[in-house]
């Protein structure tokens, strides 16, 4: 995965989980500037779809979505890697303890490595 300078790491608060690899959050840019309803696509991973007619994939997708929700409780940090092909922020979220949430989802079997955006 590409590395962003620390200047592009922001405090964030989860607003809504869209699926296992996408969520909406508010970003604290510092100096009392906050951006709400920012859509973040987790960089470098892909999870099963939670909105599909394939019942097995849906089950796995809902499990990934739930795990992402658990990992994003409280304050998180987002390392922004820029915008993806659909205009979403590509980012790597970190837990309050500094753990890479993308890597955790891969390690736990909820996600696979993905090179798209």
Q: Predicted regions span which residues?
A:
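Small beta-barrel nucleic-acid-binding modules, primarily SNase/OB-fold domains
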Residues: 1-117
């Amino acid at each position: 995965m590409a590395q962003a300078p620390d200047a592009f790491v922001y405090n964030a608060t989860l607003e809504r989980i869209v699926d296992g690899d996408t969520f909406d959050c508010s970003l604290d840019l510092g100096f009392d500037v906050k951006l709400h309803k920012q859509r973040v696509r987790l960089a470098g991973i892909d999870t099963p779809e939670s909105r599909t007619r394939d019942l097995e994939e849906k089950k796995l997708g809902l499990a990934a979505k739930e795990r992402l929700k658990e990992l994003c409780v409280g304050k998180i940090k987002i390392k922004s890697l820029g915008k993806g092909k659909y205009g979403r922020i590509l980012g790597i979220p970190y837990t309050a303890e500094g753990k890479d949430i993308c890597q955790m989802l891969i390690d736990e079997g909820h996600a696979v490595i993905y090179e798209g955006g």
